[in-house]
C-alpha cells in the first residue's frame, strides 16, 4: 500500500455503504478469530500446566526452550542525554497506527485465569533432572484440539488482513473513516543501535544492556 509510506492529512471521511459492509464483515471475522483463538490458547494452557509444579516437555507434543538474552538499546534516554548526536544520526520513519472502531474485546474465562495463575507458580529446573512426560490419550486429544484450531484460524487471519487492507486503500491519504476505522501515520525520528556503535562504541555501550534469558513454550505443529 503506497499510502503506508506517507503521513496522513488529518481528515476523516464519511462512511459509504461499501465501507460499512466491510466493517461489519471484519467484525464478524474478528469474532470468529476470538472464538477459535480461545480454544487454541486454552488447549495450550492445559498442555503447559499438565505438570502443576514444574516446566515439563511432553513427548512429541510440546517443549520448552531457552532463548538467549537480547541486547536492549535505551533510545529514549540517549535522545534526552545527547540530542545533538541523536539529530545527526537519526532518520525519519512513518509510524502507522491502524485501529477499528467499535472493535471487539476478548474476555478471559475463569478457567483460563486459573490456568494462568497455576503456570505463574510453576518452576523451571535448569538441570535435566527429570524425563519428559509420556503421551497419553488425554494429551493427544488436547494436542489435536490445538492443531485443529491452529489450522482453522489461518484462513480467518488472512481474511482479516485482506479486509483491513481494503479499508486502508479506501482511507488513502486521510486519517480515517468516521465510525469505521482510524489509520494515523506520523513522521518520527529513529536511531539504530548499529549506527551509534559505528559513531562512538564507548558511548553506545552506556545505553546498551543485556536482558534476562527467556523460556519459551512451543507446541509442535
Identify the role of each PLM range.
Residues 2-28, 34-221:
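Extended, charge-rich alpha-helical segments
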